[in-house]
Every structure is written in C-alpha cells, then in structure tokens.
C-alpha cells in the first residue's frame, strides 16, 4: 500500500470498517444501524433477499448516496472526508456498466487511467486477453457478462486494495463464475487486499467467502466468519404431525408443505425441540438460512435476536 495514502504514522488493520450506518428513504425503507469490519486479506460475502439493503450499503460505502448516520472507514481513511484518496485505492464492479455505451474498450482504459496513479497498462492488457475482450469492441455490443469482465479488468489494474463488487457473477456462466472466484482468491492471497461482494448465488459464497454479512429488511442479521454462520443453524424436516411444541418454540423460521415442513433451528436449541423420532436434522446451508428467515411463515415464537447466531 502507498504509505502516502495513509494517515501519518499509522497503518490500518482493517480494509473496511462500517459503524452505525443508517439511511432513510421517503418510501419508508431504512437501512438501520449497520456495523461490521473486514480485515485485510479476506473475502466477505454480502447476502440478503432482494430489497434487503445490499445495494444501498454498497452505494453508501462508495458515497454514491448520502448517509443519515454512521461512519465508514476504508483503508483507515474516512470515506467521506478522504474520498479522493479512498477511491484511488478502490476497485469497483457494479451490477450494470458505468461506461458510456458507445465507448470502445480501448476508450474505457483511456478514461480510467487518469483516475488511478498506479494504473498498470500491461496488466489491463493481460486481463483483456484473459477475458477475450477486443480493444475496438464497443461497450453496447458486449453482453452483460462481458461488461462485468471489463469493469473487473479496470478494478484489478491499478493495485486497488479493496474490491467492492455488486452482484459480479450475475450474467456469467458457470465456468466464468469459477474463474472469477479463482481471481478473487488469488487477489487476497498476499494478505494486503480484500474483497466485499454481494451475490444471490450462495454457491459462490460457499466456495470463496471467509466472512459473511447478512442483511434482511434493512437490518444486520449477522456479520462474522462464514464457518460460524454455517455451524449455527440446523434444518429440521418432518411430517405434518411432527411439529412439536418444543420445535415451535425453538425455530426461527419455517416453511410448510402439504407433506411436511422445513424448520430452521439454532444448533444450540436442537436438544430442546423434543420428539425427534421421525425428524430429519441436517446442517442448514446459507441459502436455507436466508430462505427460512424470510419465509412468509417466519415465526416470531423463536429466538430471533438480530446478529446473534450462537
């Protein structure tokens, strides 16, 4: 990292620190009091249902919209007061292209290069070859997936210390998604770079994320190590007559079917559900947790303290 870009006499330990972040909209939606940290050298997945506040959070980090409360530090710098220095060290991929559609790939480099003191033309060229992007191709003629790859090439070609990606795998085929996950894993391997990316494809998280931040209804449900999140819940399946009183008290979410139910229970509460004969208990996937904590039949009976998955 360029020492000149850091506060004098300090070296940050966190790539990103968000404290008490709040944003109110006239529509009534509020992103409420979100707090989390991302250390250097790790990948954080940002998850939640549509409309949960993931894109709002990313826009706030990038100062694309104003916050009502809270503080954001990027690489030890105040994201608002030190915006220019911060953005020199960010790599950004949004869910839609930020380039003018009649611009060529070559012109995209010419407009991007002056914004980044550490721009590496040879590295950008290498990514263009890797992604199969011709310099004379117009942005409007690129598929959504290829436009994402162009933004990624720009993001990776100026020694950005933090990548912020909004649904980067949307529009990519399976092979391209695997390639992207490999690139991100390599990117953080030196311990000096970090990634935060939002996604609705939980398989991507299970493959490469170290940390998970889960937002639902504008509130932080959990932020911490992905492994702890995965270990914190169990999926309990049973027939229509097997929904015991103990299970109803313990569950934090449920979806019922004609043939039975899927219930989400914190691992620590499994011994208290009673009547387990006939019930199938298994590890809950990230997708299971998101699905059942946002199901139409989400119960308020169980312990649903946000941010506490122990």
Regions found by a protein language model. Give the residues of each.
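ABC transporter nucleotide-binding domains
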Residues: 13-18, 23-203, 207-216
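C-terminal coupling/interaction segments
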Residues: 2-5, 253-310
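ABC transporter nucleotide-binding domain
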Residues: 180-267
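A general boundary/transition motif marking the beginning of the first structured unit of a protein
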Residues: 9, 100, 115, 172, ...
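Short loop/turn segments at beta->alpha junctions
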Residues: 104, 225, 282-285
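Short, surface-exposed beta-strand/loop "edge" segments at domain boundaries and coil↔beta transitions
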Residues: 163-168, 242-246, 269-274, 288
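Extreme N-terminus of proteins, especially the signal/transit-peptide cleavage junction
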Residues: 2-14
